[in-house]
Amino acid sequence: LTAGLGGDGFVLASLGCRVRLLERNPIVHSLLRDGLDRAAVAGEDDSELADIVSRMSLIEGESRDFLGRLPASEQEDIVFLDPMFPERKKSAKVKKEMQAFHLIVGSDPDAGQLLELAMQRARYRVVVKRSVSADYLAGMAPSYSLEGKSTRFDVFALQRLPG
């Protein structure tokens, strides 16, 4: 749901998921729009890429507003949140592109409220992408977490998946 830089959405779309990317920052939204437009043009010569891009839609706006207006009949199966990672406690700086992204986007002080709303609006799962060293978002312990080297995915299981 929250677009970030679009990479996770692209991966999910490449796995066959329909993905709605929401981005509230107009600069980041424009960058994502440009990237999707370029991918669509490249997809004219690459049917696999065209299929992936066709499963992605980009919406400019607040995720909270979008979820708040979503009718119950159109509930999202899974809501994926990618709020800005909190400040690092280590002295090592983040990569330059992420430093620039932090400057453009700023922090996500409303991420906890978005999580609460997502828990009400998702059908099966809410997934929150976090730094492995970060506290749980809004202090809410997930059903389980999947942890990598630097990133953790906190999964809130709301009900059994079909099938």
Where are the language model's segments positioned?
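Residues at the starts of beta-strands that form the adenosine-phosphate
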Residues: C17-R18, R125
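Mobile active-site "lid"/loop adjacent to the S-adenosyl-L-methionine
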Residues: P83-L114
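Conserved beta-strand/loop positions that form the S-adenosyl-L-methionine
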Residues: L1-A3
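Short, glycine/acidic-enriched loop or turn micro-motifs at the edges of active sites
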Residues: L5, P26, D65, M84-P86, ...
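Conserved Class I SAM-dependent methyltransferase catalytic core
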Residues: D110-A157
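Glycine-rich, phosphate-binding/catalytic loops in enzymes
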Residues: L15-C17, K95-Q99, Y144
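S-adenosyl-L-methionine
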Residues: R18, L22-I78
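Conserved SAM-binding loop of SAM-dependent methyltransferases across substrates and taxa
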Residues: L5-C17
